[in-house]
Amino acid sequence: LWFRERVRQEKIPNVWFSARDGYLPKKLYQMLDEKPTVYFMTSRIAAVEAGMEDEADIAYVDSMKFSGTLEENLRVRFGLRPDRIQVSEKDGQGLARYREAILSNAEIQRERYRAYIESLQVKDGAVAFFDFVAKGTTQMYIQKLLPNPLKGLYFLRLEPEFMSDKRVSVEAFYGTDETQGSA
């Protein structure tokens, strides 16, 4: 009900429910409102891969918590195929050595994502972007792929301070102050 009311109050013409977390909320929303909605096929990794444009993006992604080797990091978070990875601990360059490969892969993913988004026939105006529990990383990188502004409407937003300088518009139903003392 909260989500539907926010969409109505802000007169948002496009409503997207992010994949997995948005499946059931989309079904419930459609029981209340006949307005067309989109089950938006995404994941944080897919959005990040497509949205990276420069070294600052690479550094931001690298700053996120990850417990794995450099090779796993390159494969899992930056989308590099194993045949493009030749890790040498001796050169000490880490991710810098793979900058061009990361950005080249991002360009390919970006074009694919833009084709997918174009197929959705997005109307002029904002997009309400539902995610259940998130920081806003997926939304930030998806925002780079379309001209419409995204308004994140989350059930719970994690670590809002982590995204405070990223100009991501998010409103949460359940605030982090309300999570203090919860299980």
Residue map of PLM features:
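Long, low-complexity, Lys/Arg-enriched
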Residues: 1-183
